[in-house]
Every structure is written in structure tokens, then in C-alpha cells.
Amino acid sequence: MKTKRRDAVASTRRIEYNTRPMATANIPPIPAEPIRAMTPREAGHTLFASFLGWTLDAFDFFVLVFVLPKIGADFHRSVADIAFAITMTLAMRPIGAALFGWLADRYGRRTPLMIDVLLYSVVEVLSGLAPTYGSFLVLRALYGIGMGGEWGVGASLAMEAVAPKWRGFFSGLLQEGYAVGYLLAAAAYFFVYPHFGWRAMFFIGGAPALLTLYIRAKVPESEAWQRTRPDRTAILRALKKNLPMFLYLSVFLTAMSFVSHGTQDMYPTFLEKQRGLGPHHVAEIAIIYNIGAVMGGLFFGYVSDKWGRRRSIATALIIGIFIIPLWIGARSIALLTFGAFLMQFMVQGAFGVIPAHLSELSPPEVRGLFSGMAYQVGVLMAANAAFLEALIAERWGFANALGIVAVTVFVLGAVIVMLGPERAGGSLHLEA
């Protein structure tokens, strides 16, 4: 009897011990909120919001490019001194990419994007109120944080909403928000500056704040992010594992940032200072070459879905090399304008492939941080492009300065992209 009682007690204890963990092991985790795919209409709103965010961000940046000499005159500084404000903006962009990219990967894309848009809008208005050269530099540095945060978050949100077969085309559309922003800045220079001065152009830059209302009302959270939802440990692990890829992309984006900023930032100043053109002619040429930029981005973005990302980028850069003499050396205004149109068709054609290429090469757990940081580290390394060209121009003229920089970085960009990897059309979701 005692033996049977002991066996029964022991059996009961074993049952109690063994079933306790089983009771919790079979309960599935409850998600914070249900995951659902975007509808086509929601994907359209997402693409439009991301495009508009990058467009207005670029507008706020390029406003300064058109009024460098005028701000210099007001603050009694040289063009090179004011061009240093561009360097400050570009140099601070990685900080914005790190901050808002981390927030976007950790907490979702929508809210960080709205905060970022508000930040750069407010700082842009304050730039128009700057009383001194020093305060202007500080504000342009703060603006760089906002500008740096927008690209990685917006591009990740947009590319995660697009079907793989259309990713290249919509990559070109998204990236050419940059050219459209440049075009709008040229239009503001044409219509606003002659009547109200350079400060009014910065005041217009506060308009993007209204975009936050649209994002809040129409743009859902990314499905790809909802399925991943990485914690702090997963983010750090993914960054460490993919460090070689990050270093490669940073080097590649350094060359590409020199391609873009080296052909754009000082070109209006070249037209004004060396070719003797007035504000209206400068604005007209800028509008035309930015139309070329938009067309190039859409064309090469679409072609990259057929040819591949690397081949499309390299082709645009190689053709661009042969356009340089016409771009800076044409004698007539008509030919100079045509050269500028072709140049930006190729430059932004190559850059139009970048959002898709970076999104496909970035780990899903850290796409916002990884792609944004690689992009902005490249920008940081090229932050002195305008300042460098201004210094070279003081000795050899703007045409030679632009040409030397352009031919060098076009060759480097084509070589680097062809040496790198490619995942054209690959899934942007975390693989099980």
C-alpha cells in the first residue's frame, strides 16, 4: 500500500512538473496588430507621398544653389564661403539617415517620415530669417539632418509597396522627385526671386509641412516592415553581418554623389559667372535640363527591369562622359542648353536606378537604416563637391572645374557598379 501511494504521488508530481511548460509552449504569440497587404490604391498613395516628400526636400535644398551669389553679397562673403553651407548640409545628412533610419526600422516607416518632413520644413523657413552668415550655416546644418532622414525612410516605404516587375520604373519615378524639386526651385527663382528676393524662396520651403497631413490620412504602414518588426538585437546583428555590403554601397554612393552634385550644384553659378547669363536665362536652362533628368530617370529605371541595375547605371555614365564637352563648352546658348539636357538625362538616368538597387541589396531587418546610411555616407564623402569646384574655378574657371570633376567620377562610378553585386527583382520580404 505504501509503495502504491508513493508511486501515485510521484506520478502526480511528474505530471504537474511536465505539464507546466507545455501549457505555455503551445500558446502562439499575439501580434500587436493584424498584418495586411496594401491595396493598389494605398500603394499609389504611398508612392505619391514618397515622391512628393523627396521632391519637396530637393526643392528646399536647391533653392540655395540658385541664390549663392546673392546671399554672399548680403552677408559680405565669397561664393566659396556660401557654397560651404551646401557642404554643411551634405555633411549632416548621415546623422539624419542614422536617426530616422533606426526609428523607421524599429517602429515603422510612417511616423518617422512625418516627423522628418516637419523638421526640414521648419528649418527651411528659419533659414530665410537668418540674420548672419554664422546662423545661416547652423540652420543649413540642421536642415541636413532632415534631408538625410527622408531618403532612406521614403525609399524603403515606396519600394516595399511596388510589385517587383515595376520596381525599376517606380524607382526612377521616385528618384526623379529630386529633379522635379530642382525644377520647382528653378521656377521659384524665375518667378519669385526677381520680385521678393532670396529670403522669400526659403519661406516657400515651409510648404512641405502640409504633406504630413496627407501621409497620416492616406499612407498605411509597410507590409514588409510589419512582417519583420526587428528588435534592437536583430537590427544590430543584421548590421554586423552585412558590414561588407554596407562598405561597398558607401563607396559606390560616394562616386554617384559626386556625379550628381558635381554636375548640378555649381552649374547655375557657372552659367551666371562664366557665361554671363541673367536669372531668367539660368532658370530657363535649369528647367529644361531638369525635364531631361526626369525623362532619364524614368527611361533608365524602366530599362533596368530589362537589362539589370548595374548595366543600366554603367551605360548612362559612360554615355555621359562623351556629353561633357557640349555641356560646358558649347558656344551658343541653344547648344549649351541641349548639352545640359543630355547631361542630366544621363546623370539622373543612372541615379534613377539607385532606390531599387539599394533596396534589393539591403537586409530586410534594417532596410531603412542600411540604405539611408549608405546613401548619406556617400553624400558625406562628396560633401565638398561644390566647395572643391568653387576653389578650382577661382584658378582655372568654372568650365574646367566642372569638366575635371565630371570625367573623373563618371569613370569611377561605372567601374565600381560593375564590380558589385545585383539582386534585380528579388523579394524585399524577410526570407523564412
Question: Where in this protein do the model-derived segments appear?
Answer:
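Conserved MFS/SLC helix-loop-helix module at the cytosolic interface between two early adjacent transmembrane helices
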Residues: 95-131, 307
